[in-house]
A protein has these predicted regions:
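Loop/helix patches that line or flank the sugar-binding groove of alpha-linked glycan CAZymes
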Residues: 329-332, 341-484
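Beta-sheet entry/capping signal
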Residues: 75, 119-121, 221-223, 256-258, ...
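Short, solvent-exposed loop/turn segments at secondary-structure junctions
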Residues: 45-47, 83, 128-129, 221, ...
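Beta-strand-rich binding/interaction modules
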Residues: 482-502
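Conserved alpha/beta catalytic core and glycan-binding cleft of carbohydrate-active enzymes
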Residues: 133-170, 247-391
Length: 526
């Protein structure tokens, strides 16, 4: 490692503007039209209600596109929007329609068009592992099985849909449930009402190709693939083959089609799934309450550890698929929120967001994360609470009621959006600045870490990201107090600072003073 000396100092930094810094979000360069995006995950049910029924809808998302774009996000992931029996809609009854609670196909067409007009790419959740027990495929298969005599064998020619699922006359484990009125059991790993599909069936493969063609024809830019590890339990080779075949079909229809897959596992297992040649996997190795981002934000690990793990992760994935696009995130709809993991500590919550948005790839922000929204306990409904637009409880301002079984009286730790927008020190404005810095410097997302400089103090780290002729240097300070880093040999200038108290890094005589809990962006002097 290259060696630079860092000296920890105790004085409070004076807010002097460094070279090129404005203290405002950076100017956005002309957008690079590729699949590196800043994604915003939306649970439509709880986001924005356009018609006053208490449930979020597609028109509500469309109304908030300017908000999402101004925040700095240029990609949106919609959690499932297809007809379903549940509030979360992961039990799909029809893959080629919109749940009536959310609107219509025409509403989706309008949303797609408005997203594209604002240079926002729209991806939707695709649940390929299972369907609803109310899906016509499953109903037809069960009706056929119930019609069989005790000694009569299944004939796929009589009912092709029997081949769409896993059926057996034996209850192979506790994830198998009896088909009422028959001698057969079906597999349903997640829930009895979500029977698992048989993805080795050529007919099922063709069904999903038709489904993909339907959505691509309407203008959808990609799919978030749900539960890919569970396509065939414990069979990575089969699962990656399914993913690869499906992805290749999608890009044959739309060459820039994007796919990001859920592989809830450690780094090495995620790397195995990159053998599929699909572009992105969610980086669960860095996420969650015990992930590297949260640990660094709350001081359980330091800057040196964070950047080392980050570089190791990038190298691990790149060895398998050199064209991979990492998909880092902090938490999602299945996890307790960042606010809970960091005990409502505002500085730590901000810093976690800053760390995320300094990482390579396409980061994903869970709606409300930019406000420091809170969840409660292990109940999933409490991880999917209404977006906090304002304190107005009249029901006339688009605020949703949230899932029926959620605890709607949760006291949030931070102000609603309308107040945070006006507060330059808010979590919202921190996130907005972090995103705008990222957009102004495409090399942050696209570059690779090629150098970690030795600065002698583990709480301080300096890295270089580079891509072709472009490069950026990023200095991390994970401690509460400010510090100095001698960088005379690098001929750098500060282009922006992201700090929890809005103070700025100052470069003087080859020594940079960086605030506590800060990320400083530098480039070579021209």
């Amino acid at each position: 490692m290259k060696r630079i000396i860092a000296v920890v100092v105790s004085f409070v930094l004076v807010m002097i503007i460094g070279c090129g810094q404005t203290g405002e979000p950076g100017n956005i360069k002309e957008a690079v039209d590729d699949n590196y995006r800043n994604y915003y995950e939306v649970f439509v049910y709880s986001y924005f209600d356009s018609n006053g029924d208490g449930i979020g809808d597609l028109k509500g998302v469309e109304e908030k596109l300017d908000y999402i774009a101004d925040l700095g996000c240029n990609g949106i992931w919609l959690m499932p929007v297809m007809p379903s029996t549940t509030y979360h809609k992961y039990d799909v009854m029809d893959y080629c329609d919109i749940d009536k609670e959310y609107g219509t196909l025409e509403d989706m067409d309008s949303l797609i068009n408005e997203c594209h007009a604002k240079d926002i790419r729209l991806i939707i959740d695709l649940v390929m592992n299972h369907t609803s027990s109310k899906h016509p495929w499953f109903i037809a298969a069960c009706d056929y099985l119930k019609s069989l005599e005790a000694d009569e064998e299944i004939d796929i020619a009589e009912c092709p849909y029997v081949d769409y699922y896993h059926f057996s006359k034996e209850q192979l484990n506790n994830s198998w449930y009896r088909v009422p009125g028959s001698d057969y059991y079906y597999e349903a790993v997640f829930w009895s009402e979500m029977p698992d599909l048989n993805l080795s069936s050529e007919s099922v493969k063709q069904e999903f190709e038709s489904i993909a063609a339907f959505w691509i024809d309407r203008g959808i830019d990609g799919f978030r693939m749900d539960a890919t590890m569970h396509f065939e339990e414990g069979d990575t080779a089969f699962n990656t083959e399914v993913m690869n075949d499906f992805y290749e079909y999608c890009v044959s229809l739309k060459p820039d089609f994007y796919m990001v897959s859920e592989v809830w596992a450690n780094r090495d297992t995620i790397a195995d799934y990159y053998l599929s040649d699909t572009p992105s996997m969610f980086d669960f190795s860095m996420s969650g309450a015990e992930g590297e981002i949260i640990k660094a934000a709350r001081g359980n690990s330091n800057a040196e550890s964070f950047v080392t793990k980050l570089k190791e992760t990038e190298e691990t994935y790149r060895k398998v698929n050199e064209d991979y696009i990492n998909a880092p995130f902090i938490t999602n709809h299945d996890m307790s929120r960042v606010c809970n993991a960091l005990n409502s500590n505002e500085d730590d919550i901000k810093f976690a967001g800053g760390l995320l948005l300094s990482m390579g790839g396409s980061p994903f922000i869970y709606y409300g994360e930019e406000l420091g929204m809170k969840s409660k306990g292990k109940k999933d409904e409490n991880k999917r609470l209404p977006m906090q637009w304002s304190d107005d409880a009249s029901g006339m301002n688009g605020i949703c009621e949230g899932p029926l079984d959620s605890d709607r009286d949760i006291n949030q730790s931070f102000d609603t959006l309308d107040k945070q927008i006006e507060d330059e020190t808010s979590i919202y404005n921190y996130y907005r600045k972090a995103l705008h810095i990222r957009n102004a410097n495409p090399v942050i997302a696209r570059g690779t870490i090629d150098t970690i400089y030795d600065v002698t103090d583990g709480d301080i780290a300096l890295i270089r990201r580079s891509e072709l002729s472009d490069e950026i240097y990023i200095a991390y300070n994970t401690q509460e107090s400010s510090a100095e880093i001698a960088i005379q040999d690098l001929n750098l200038e500060v282009i922006d600072t992201l700090s929890v108290d809005n103070s700025l890094s100052v470069l003087k005589n080859g020594v940079i003073s960086v605030p506590g809990k800060s990320i400083t962006y530098l480039k070579r002097r021209q």
